[in-house]
Amino acid sequence: KNKKNAEQLSKNTKEAYPSKDIQIQNDDCNTKLIELSKFLLSPEGRNLKVLAYIDPYGMQLEWKSIVSLSRASIDIWILVPTGLGVNRLLKRNGEITETWLTRLEMFLGLDAETIKSFFYKIEKDLTLFGEEEHTTKEKDAIKLSANIYQERLKSVFSFVSHPYILKSTQGNIMYHMFMASNNKTAVKIANDIIKTYNE
């Protein structure tokens, strides 16, 4: 989203890795990822092997973009905003605005009812006036959202790593990062790296 940051990143990577073909894209990630997928499936791109680092702005990444990549010869590292994104949209009482619910649907690739069934439960309390129902958010929704996203990745990629957990200086979980691939060895290496950094 920030042109200056993208230019600086491009400059830094070219200086650090002058022999590598590294491309920094500062555009709508969904458009670019679908274009990349189409190219990798084309005659010009089908013999290429790509490693993509996906660091979406907020929750702008759409599930359809991940599905498109799963068909190509690509390994992806994806930063999933479980604490800073998904969890913040999930209101404790289950009253999520239509806008936020639509964003969750597009991000997770799930319908509204499925999302609600994962993250909320109906509890009944006995009162003087009989039973009353109320909706409550599941405990540890951040971990739950990471598990759901990991399972979603497994539904389209053959292999998915354990998550690397990124926390704030206060120890709050902000992100879970996964590697997804159709290459078993790539994910085995990713898991070895993740294990080292999660300790």
Q: Where on the chain are the PLM-derived regions?
A:
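Class I S-adenosyl-L-methionine-dependent methyltransferase catalytic core
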Residues: 1-199
